[in-house]
């Protein structure tokens, strides 16, 4: 059966209050300084809202106070709105929250131009606040695109085909964010747009990690407030790309998109690739919503082990160590 993604479920605690312990068997050290307070501005669509909370909670680790924030201009259904009303604060509360750092997630794009998205003005205001306040901020995927567009007028460019899969990303600079990490690490990417590396470096951004296949992965701003930008998704669970693929092929069957999606690259085990390729051929030939029932199950189409999670945890540990050092210097 086709899985359209995990809907929001009522929970007794938000991800901000869960202690998820280790990531991929990695034990988190005790905080070096006082307990940090980190904000998560979650702009993901309803179907991924709670999952995204948990993913970033896992990477931020225990011993950190996580505060949840949302933009009023991201469209929400009633169940998601109830969750936000219970566990989240609005964008207006950011300034008085006493944050040591902020993570800003991506969002599901709807408009052809990023500046035309209904949430763009509010997101731009958050970028301005982070820049003026000096709060270290990490921007993920679409949020990274929005930030550099607002700060420096760097337009993202549409890709001929979607970058979807696990890609080897190689360090191209020395930086504390990469301390203790291998020179090349796997990173999930899932995006229809790209930031040109030349445009970033011309405006003073420093690329730290890139891929021969998908371009810039990780970069930082060299002036002003501390800002980190990710085009990839190190926070992803092992099955996230699988769920995105199932969602997109479902949209093809339902006539919501013109072409079927390509399989995520370097992601599925060989047997799963054969099963999914066979189904995609049937879907192209006999496109119909009735084919939802014939889609191979998740158990029949296993992805490879989530080899990126150790490096993802290392990146966030290094980022939080830099935040902790900044807090100690300001004390």
From Swiss-Prot:
Pathway: Amino-acid biosynthesis; L-methionine biosynthesis via de novo pathway; O-succinyl-L-homoserine from L-homoserine: step 1/1
Record's catalysed reaction(s): L-homoserine + succinyl-CoA = O-succinyl-L-homoserine + CoA
Record's protein name: Homoserine O-succinyltransferase
E.C. code: 2.3.1.46
Enzyme kind, highest EC tier: transferase
Biological process, per Gene Ontology: methionine biosynthetic process
Function in brief: Transfers a succinyl group from succinyl-CoA to L-homoserine, forming succinyl-L-homoserine.
Assigned protein family: Belongs to the MetA family.
InterPro entries to which the protein is assigned, alphabetical: Class_I_gatase-like, MetA_family
GO CC field: cytoplasm
Gene3D superfamilies hit by this protein: 3.40.50.880
Alphabetic keyword roster: Acyltransferase, Amino-acid biosynthesis, Cytoplasm, Methionine biosynthesis, Transferase
Binding site for substrate: 162, 190, 247
Species for this entry: Methylorubrum extorquens (strain DSM 6343 / CIP 106787 / DM4) (Methylobacterium extorquens)
Major location category of this protein: cytoplasm
Active site residues per record: 141 (acyl-thioester intermediate), 233 (proton acceptor), 235
Pfam families membership: HTS
Location of this chain's protein in the cell: Cytoplasm
